Amino acid sequence: MSWQQYVDDHLMCDIDGNRLTAAAILGQDGSVWSQSATFPAFKPEEIAAILKDFDQPGTLAPTGLFLGGTKYMVIQGEAGAVIRGKKGSGGITVKKTNQALIIGIYDEPLTPGQCNMIVERLGDYLIEQGL
């Protein structure tokens, strides 16, 4: 299965008639493995800040998580494994695997829990595969 199929079939999937706004799988060096057409253009320093928070949990909380110039307020996650952010009626979930970052961006009517489930389910699968 190609990385694009993972994005199309597993991240941009239909959940009760709703889907993520955007999704991507990035290498931990910030390279794009695959992304939805709607995924925002991001800066390398935004990915570097996300990776730093995985290594040193709590570093994003004071400043917020930025992706594509959009600021998300960092909310509870799982230290070293998952970062979650909120902005208005939407938000972001970032799951770290051994080699990649799985990113899902959502807005209503999709719920934070649905976004978490979509992103973390694929992330857990890739971890099981050694990726």
Swiss-Prot record:
Molecular function (Gene Ontology), one example: actin monomer binding
Any Pfam family hit: Profilin
Cellular component, GO, one term: cytoskeleton
Paired cysteines (S-S): none
Subcellular location: Cytoplasm, Cytoskeleton
Gene3D superfamilies reported in the protein's UniProt record: Dynein light chain 2a, cytoplasmic
Main subcellular location: cytoplasm
Annotated keywords: Actin-binding, Allergen, Cytoplasm, Cytoskeleton
Role of this protein: Binds to actin and affects the structure of the cytoskeleton. At high concentrations, profilin prevents the polymerization of actin, whereas it enhances it at low concentrations. By binding to PIP2, it inhibits the formation of IP3 and DG.
Assembly and interaction partners: Occurs in many kinds of cells as a complex with monomeric actin in a 1:1 ratio.
UniProt record similarity statement: Belongs to the profilin family.
UniProt protein name: Profilin
Annotated organism of origin: Prunus dulcis
